[in-house]
Each structure stands twice: as structure tokens, then as C-alpha cells.
Amino acid sequence: AAAMVKKCTEALANNKNGMITLGAYGGYVTFHFDHSVANVQGQKDLYITGNAMANGAEPGIVMVSKDVNGNGLPDDPWYELSGSADVDAPSNVVYNYEITYILDAMQNVPWTDNQNNSGTVERNTYHKQEYFPLWLESPLTFKGTLLPKNAVNKGENGAQNWQLRAFRYGYVDNLPNNDIEGNSFDISWAVDADRKPVTLDAIDFVRVYLSLIHISEPTRRSY
């Protein structure tokens, strides 16, 4: 785990403009600042970039936490920043979602969820490394919010031409980086596990996790 933290820090810290991949649903990265980030009323407080392009959205949900106990560790309560899916399509959002991955060394990674779905995260030619985080035990379960599917096949006559549609606001790697407003986040969007608003004057940690799992029928492949 320490080696992965070091690699991520080297890629992202001090405005390096590097890139990391979060993998499939639930994969996450946590950021810690050298100062608290104030919740400025009436303004966005965070700007988080990804590598989204038109029809290539891979939205990640943002969570925030305040270092209440002052120990410098992300072990205080976490709160999700509510995004547009909670307004535009709440009936299609799966809250309290759970997915479990099983280690199969250097092979496709099988998974099951609490919605009676199953599939595999397929290996591809672009990423040769082990897909399962070997510093964690198998089985590995992630819990969170599952956003509505954003993949649309625009191919004709049986052709495959998948587009990943963007949500209106509130997610990382959802809109191109030149959309400053679309990649900015308000700490005032924070909600608790019951989706009730939470008042935070400042935060010390930010977490981004991948919030989709697409299943390609009939192969049950995931991406």
C-alpha cells in the first residue's frame, strides 16, 4: 500500500498533472491537504480534473471528511457530495450499493453485487499489471452509491459504437477539464448516509471513487 501511495503522490502532488486509474467500481484515491479547505458560502470550494472528453465520461463520486480528532488520518466520518443524478434520476440511482471482487491472479477479476448481478472485469492490452490490489485481502467489498448507466450504443447495423454520456454536474472525470464550473465542487453539497444535508465549515480530506460498473450482455464483461 505504501508503494502505491508513493506512486500516486509522485504523479499528482504539487501540480504534477499526472494521471492514475481507479479501476472498476469502488476503486478510490484519497487526498490530504497541508491546510483545511474552507467551505466558502456561495462559492465552489474544490476543482478536480480527470481525462474526460466528449462522450467519454467515467464519473467518480466525491467524498469529503474533516479531521475532527486532529490526528491527521482519514478516520473521521465521510460525507458524499450529492451530484446531479440525485436530482435528475434518483429512482435510477442505487444507494447502499455493494460489490465484491475475488482475486484470480493476473486473470479477469470476477465480481458479484447486492443487486443479483455478476460479471468479470476484463483484462485489456493497455494495462498489463495485476488488476486486483494485492495489498488488500480477497474477497474485497466496496460500498457506496451506484450511478445510472451512462453507456449508450450509437452503432448502426449491429456495429458497436459506445458513448459514455456525461451527467450535468457533481462528478469527477465527467466533463472535459476546460469546463471549470463542471469540474468544481461545493462542500455544501455534502450529505450523510441518509442523504440528509451536512453542514461543514471546512474539510481536510477528499476521496474520489469510481461510481459505475457496466455489464456487456451476453458476455457479462464489465468495464
Model-derived features: where do they sit?
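Short N-terminal edge-element motif at the start of the domain
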Residues: 2-67
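Extracytoplasmic, non-cytosolic globular domains
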Residues: 57-64, 72-86
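Acidic, glycine-anchored loop motifs typical of Ca2+
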Residues: 68-77, 93-95, 101
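Low-complexity, serine/threonine/proline-enriched polar segments
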Residues: 84-179
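A Trp-anchored, charged/polar loop motif used as the substrate-binding/catalytic surface
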Residues: 180-196
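Extracellular Ig-like/FN3 beta-sandwich strand-entry sites
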Residues: 201-203
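Short beta-strand-plus-loop segments that form exposed binding edges in beta-rich domains
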Residues: 208-212
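Residue-level detector of conserved catalytic or cofactor/ligand-binding positions
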Residues: 213-219
